[in-house]
A protein has these predicted regions:
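Mid-to-C-terminal alpha-helical segments outside catalytic/metal-binding sites
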Residues: 1-17, 29, 33-69, 73-81, ...
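Histidine-centered catalytic micro-motifs
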Residues: 13-26, 230-236
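Divalent metal-coordination and catalytic microenvironments
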Residues: 18, 103, 169, 234, ...
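Active-site beta-loop-alpha junctions enriched in small/polar residues
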Residues: 20, 108, 133-139, 172-176, ...
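Alpha-helical scaffold segments that flank or form the walls of functional sites
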Residues: 30-124, 130, 152-164
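Acidic (Asp/Glu)-rich catalytic clusters
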Residues: 93-97, 115-130, 157-166, 223-226, ...
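Divalent metal-binding pocket/active-site signature
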Residues: 164-276
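H/E-rich (His + Asp/Glu) clusters that bind or coordinate divalent metals
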Residues: 254-256, 262-380
Length: 380
């Protein structure tokens, strides 16, 4: 591998096709520590344990220099310096160091102190596009004065009003109901209306607003398809509210075989530990794409193996870059940093072994870093 190839990977601008806002407001160390754990959706019993992880080690190795500290600084000194700079300055430094030209932001999950898309564009000095989360849109609608009996037309109209200002739609079906449902056809209007009525009754009786009805979620998916929106589906690893065995993308086979699903790009997000299954689906279906974003940060140095596996079966025109970062902007930076490290190491080895030419490697880097996302989402 030549130094010029390593420099090429370092300089390539990325399109992060699935990400969330960074924090813009200061808070305490416990918020920061809890943000470094994906699996536990509650508050950590020992927040400092978050530092004793692949992500914690990667953060102290790669992010320390961005805030003027030596590599591998202690967690105590890292937090002290971070507090001196403040959250907004951290977000500015980290997002700009990531080398991302376009952030495609899922605005459907928000926490206190998080930057909105306009704030992200300003702080990162980059272009921002919005991804609409279908379940959040439905939850907004069901809490309105809209008669649930008219849910079909109301949701269709609401999503259609968003279509001109977003570049895609995202579903968290994996979290809410799992993939083990028949999604191959749009549900009947009467079934949708009945499910909406039951949902409203549950809320009025003091139940949760959280949408977990597979009929309504499936209806949302097919609405997005009918509008021609690229469809993002969270796959695999997430917090403990998700049943991992029901988040295997192979359970989507009947859906992907359907005529309806073939009409739009279907993007399998993150996929760990099902990246090989996702790679098979990307090879098997013309309209299926994947990334391995979320797990990259959490695997730290071991993400090199994950990223290498993503290049086994999937055509290189079907792999995209994402970080799925949310909250601390270190995650927005680390996603890019660890991806560049892995690509340089993995592709570099293939070049050195004369399995790949450097010209081919450069071309694939550009495909995954940005060109595939440009094509799928119709970005300028």
């Amino acid at each position: 591998m030549t130094e010029s190839f390593a420099g090429f990977v370092e300089d390539v601008r990325l399109i992060d096709h699935h990400v969330h806002g960074a924090y813009g407001a200061d808070s305490n160390e416990e918020r920061f520590q809890n943000s470094l754990n994906e699996g536990n959706c509650g508050l950590l019993a020992e927040p400092s344990a978050a530092y004793e992880s692949q992500l914690g080690f990667a953060l102290r190795r790669w992010c320390a220099e961005i805030i003027d500290l030596p590599r591998h600084v202690t967690a105590e000194l890292y937090w002290r310096r971070r507090s001196e700079l403040g959250e907004l300055e951290i977000s500015r430094r980290m997002t700009r160091a990531a080398g991302v030209s376009h952030w495609l932001i899922d605005t459907g999950f928000k926490t206190a102190g998080m930057l909105d898309p306009r704030g992200m564009a300003e702080i990162a000095g980059a272009t921002v596009h919005e991804i609409v989360r279908l379940e959040t849109l439905a939850e907004t609608l069901i809490q309105s004065d809209q008669d649930p009996g008219g849910y079909v037309d109301a949701f269709t109209g609401l999503l259609a009003s968003h279509a001109p200002i977003v570049v895609g739609a995202k579903s968290v079906l994996a979290y809410r109901a799992g993939f083990n449902h028949d999604l191959s056809r749009p549900p009947a209007d009467r079934d949708v209306a009945e499910s909406a009525k039951l949902w409203r009754q549950r809320i009025e009786s003091g139940g949760a607003v959280r949408l977990d009805d597979p009929t309504l979620i499936g209806f949302g998916l097919h609405c997005a398809i009918s509008l021609g929106l690229p469809l993002q589906l969270h796959v695999g690893f997430g917090d403990r509210e998700l049943d991992l065995d029901r988040a295997n993308p192979l359970l989507l086979l009947d859906f992907l075989r359907s005529v309806e699903a073939s009409k739009v790009p279907v993007l399998l997000l993150h996929c760990y530990p099902f990246e090989r299954e996702a790679g098979y689906l990307a090879q098997a279906f013309d309209n299926v794409y994947l990334d391995v974003g979320l797990a990259v940060n959490h695997l730290g140095v071991r993400s090199r193996s994950l990223i290498a596996r993503s290049f086994e079966l999937a055509p290189f025109t079907k792999i995209l870059y994402s970080s799925d970062a949310i909250g601390p902007a270190e995650l927005h930076y680390l996603g890019a940093r660890l991806w560049r490290n892995a690509i340089t190491a993995v592709f570099g080895r293939w070049i050195d072994d004369d399995e790949w030419s450097e010209a081919d490697a450069r071309r694939v880097v550009e495909l995954v870093a940005r060109d595939n996302a440009r094509r799928v989402y119709g970005l300028p």
